[in-house]
A protein has these predicted regions:
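A short glycine-rich, His/Asp/Glu-containing loop-to-beta-strand
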Residues: 67-87
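Non-heme Fe(II)/2-oxoglutarate
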Residues: 1-72
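A short beta-strand-loop-beta hairpin characteristic of the jelly-roll/cupin
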Residues: 104-125
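Short, conserved beta-strand element in jelly-roll/cupin
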Residues: 84, 95-111
């Protein structure tokens, strides 16, 4: 895991989040050309692959959120999503096939990743964490 030095303004991100359509646990900020469905990139990668597309095809920004879109551009991201983790919940233990960027927006000292069987805390809001 790489912990980036720069920090992002979580207040600005939260303000832009308010402009998005209603969503529950995740919303995709990018899709493939011609698709405006903000749920298409959510869930399992298999859904994307079964449609004949690749994860890397999801580069077209769906929303006018300039600050977040500038982060997408800076890192050349695709299939970017916001996730909402409810209290006392967690992701299933898994390994992504591609590099991931995580920027906690609201977090606490109990949040962590498990990387190579080691607990890594992610207490800093706005701090980017690159997982490969």
């Amino acid at each position: 895991m790489i912990v980036e030095r720069r920090m992002y303004d979580t207040e600005r991100i939260l303000l832009e989040l308010e402009s998005l359509p209603d969503w529950d646990l995740q919303i995709c900020l990018q899709s493939y050309e011609g698709n405006r469905d903000h749920t298409f990139g959510c869930g399992l990668l298999k859904k994307i692959l079964d449609s004949g597309r690749r994860e890397e095809d999801l580069v077209h920004k769906l929303f006018n959120i300039p600050y977040v879109n500038s982060i997408i551009d800076e890192y050349k991201l695709y299939r970017t999503k916001f996730f909402l983790m409810r209290p006392k919940t967690c992701y299933s233990y898994h390994r992504d096939q591609t590099k991931r960027l995580h920027i906690p927006i609201v977090t606490n000292d109990k949040c962590f990743f498990v990387i190579n069987d080691k607990v890594v805390r992610t207490p800093e809001e706005g701090r980017p964490y690159v997982l490969d």
